[in-house]
């Protein structure tokens, strides 16, 4: 019922749109009354003018909407429709209302009757959305059907070219554009009017009148058992047979249901290509013109009975429904894809905005980075200059330090040299001291020797003086004794001479001892001077290597060369020794 209602609404929409003169979506009440009356008449629905007046009591015009004509149409007409009206009459009534306003004035290769059939086919194949259009897939399906019915070859490349231009302009064709497309012969070149008209009629019978198969066959009568040629028309639940193909004189129907069956019969009584259609109360024996026709009819009837068992619609309606569901699915997928694309676009825009914000931030960051880089470069240049200065200064300091290290090394070497020299000086001082000590010992020995010699000389001198005195005394003695004394004198003179010689020898030895003493004294002075010189050098070097520290509180003797290397007691001892030496000399 829902599918029937949708098909009826499409034709009514054309009629209502034709009555809408100013395209406002509204039609006057008087026109709606006429339309409603005509609809009730062709649809065999009781007409209630009071309900119409009541429905549009406050409106001069009624738009086709939920608030306008549609609620009345649904409630008082469409809900009461039964499947007992003439669909062709209904469609022709709606066609009559809209054809004059919409059909093109350009000359067409088809008749108005053919245009009407195309219009009805359009309503069957169009989408369930308003305004009604037929999409490219259904146009291709219809054109293929027509080309097949005309016995021509389908030009897919030509349609693809047309489809490209078609898709670029709009989503589909209106009924009048479809009529003009078929009527101008674009896809039926080389075909005459009659062939095109027959093809349109064949497709109309299949799609609109649900004619599954039709053709001439022989039928055996039930009463007289004779064979008569009839025009058979197979529909989803019935096989009708007529005197001729003009369908004016109907001779009977074969009602089909799920209990019917079709069987092939062998040839008999001179009749060939026989088959049997068994129904609940009757059996129909039919003869086809040839085996191919026989097989086609058996297959068609068998398929029809099978569809009745399954409760399925006719193949063309089922195919249309599948195509619609496929398009609906594709549309849903496309809408889902578009929704996803919109979401992706929104996300992309959001990402773009984020990227733009990030780009701006990056630009700002780049600007800041450039500024920072500039500052960094400037700072780097400054740091480099400062580092260069620091490096130069460090090099200078390093050079100075190296010079200082070299100087310190030189000073250390000099210090070590002075230490070595000082050690040598100490050794030489010790040698000088040893020489001085030895000289003192030699001086002491010489002095003792000199003292001994002086003592011996004094003793000899005293002895000589004694002898001289004795000699003088002897002179004063007697002359007698003088000779004796002379002799003694001679002896004594000899002894004196010997003593004088000894004295001279002692004097010589004393002089030699004195010379030796002078030499020793000179050596002592030289040793003393040498010792003093080495002591001064040692003191000088000790002063160079001595750490600076608080001086001693004890008083020191000061010489021409600085502090003395000996104490006051040592000085007194030396003065005492010197005086003794002077006294001895």
Swiss-Prot record:
GO CC annotation: actin cytoskeleton; cytoplasm; cytosol; lamellipodium; nucleus; plasma membrane; postsynapse
Domain commentary: The PH domain is essential for phosphatidylinositol 3,4,5-trisphosphate binding.
Protein name in UniProt: Switch-associated protein 70
Domain PH: 210-306
Posttranslational mods: Tyrosine-phosphorylated.
Coiled coil feature spans: 316-539
Keyword Chloroplast: no
InterPro entries the record matches: EF-hand-dom_pair, EF_hand_dom, PH-like_dom_sf, PH_domain
GO molecular function: ATP binding; cadherin binding; calcium ion binding; DNA binding; guanyl-nucleotide exchange factor activity
